[in-house]
Amino acid sequence: MTAPPRIAFLASPAEPAVAARARLVQRFGDHALDCADIVCALGGDGFMLQTLHRHGASNKPVFGMKLGSVGFLMNQYRDDEDDLLERLQRAEPAYLRPLEMQVQTESGASAGSLAYNEVSLLRQTRQAAHLSIDLNGQTRIAELIGDGVMVATPAGSTAYNYSAHGPILPLGSHTLALTPIAPYRPRRWRGAILKADTAVRFRVLDPYKRPVSVTADSHEIRDVVEVTIRESTQRQVTLLFDPEHNLEERIFSEQFAV
């Protein structure tokens, strides 16, 4: 007989998530992350992203249950907790590779971060951002004027990217979305779909008069002068989903939401 998986239950600070964790720990035990087989994250998408950033290097599959305001990356939480082991056994994996971001700031400092949804550059003041865009070392947009620009993964393409009129990308398509944010010039440019291995470089053309910040998921860095982005070849995380509502189907269905 196969032993049940050891589950590490993580919860957001929200009261419903904390209460659910207490019940689940009482039912299934409390296993430390380093000796667990599966991570169960209780909260919303923000907490899921936090979990991936903090524990993605552990290579433990993550099964999320929605106990927050937004739950695109989560499964539904069910009051019948006894069916959790069956759900985990039937769950389908979705493999995500984050974006790797490297930043140079106006002060000369360097920084880096990962993003599972998107990396977005935004103007810091009332002045529009002036940016250049290089792809694989070739300048494609010499000067983009607008509120900013972003690079989104397929998993993140239904979030901020879609709100900025970017394309929804199928999971497993090995593509990225390059999407301008409120572009003024060139006005007709609406972005591009890139191969996942494309090296993207943004340069801020007037960082003193028109300062720009960059955010990788929730990690913000201000006063940047250059940002390089590419998909990670080293890091991959596994999310688990109920087969009747897997991530691939959710992304596909978003294209027909009205």
From Swiss-Prot:
This is NAD kinase. Its cofactor is a divalent metal cation. It comes from Xanthomonas oryzae pv. oryzae (strain MAFF 311018). The active site is at D45 (proton acceptor). Keywords: ATP-binding, Cytoplasm, Kinase, NAD, NADP, Nucleotide-binding, Transferase. The lineage of its organism: Bacteria, Pseudomonadati, Pseudomonadota, Gammaproteobacteria, Lysobacterales. SUPFAM superfamilies: NAD kinase/diacylglycerol kinase-like. NCBIfam families: PRK04761.1. Involved in the regulation of the intracellular balance of NAD and NADP, and is a key enzyme in the biosynthesis of NADP. Catalyzes specifically the phosphorylation on 2'-hydroxyl of the adenosine moiety of NAD to yield NADP. GO terms for biological process: NAD metabolic process; NADP biosynthetic process. Its EC number is 2.7.1.23.
